[in-house]
């Protein structure tokens, strides 16, 4: 079953945080408090979409990706961003956070 397409309403330039070793990416459309996260089921990568209190898309995480460009990531996550120019997207390496051992 194909997930319903979500639309990004912000006009802010997105930032794509990439972890090519893990095949993961996070596309951040805006900074806001995440109210809830929904998973998108379908063929392809594992997709989780972060939403704010008004159900607007904050960002989307994809795991199991091989191509790291905005149009492909949006297509794989069933998200439209009509007000965003993919050419302006910033791509950065995801920061590695140290895992703290359990005490």
Language-model features, listed with the residues they occupy:
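Small, basic N-terminal interaction modules of short regulatory proteins
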Residues: 1-103
């Amino acid at each position: 079953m194909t997930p319903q397409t979500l639309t990004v309403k912000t006009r802010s330039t997105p930032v794509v945080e990439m972890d090519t070793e893990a095949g993961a990416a996070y596309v951040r459309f805006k900074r806001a408090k995440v109210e809830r996260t929904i998973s998108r089921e379908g063929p392809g990568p594992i997709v989780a979409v972060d939403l704010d209190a008004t159900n607007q898309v904050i960002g989307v995480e994809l795991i199991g990706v091989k191509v790291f460009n905005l149009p492909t990531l949006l297509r794989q996550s069933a998200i439209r961003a009509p007000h965003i120019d993919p050419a302006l997207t910033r791509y950065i390496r995801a920061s590695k956070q140290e895992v703290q051992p359990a005490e």
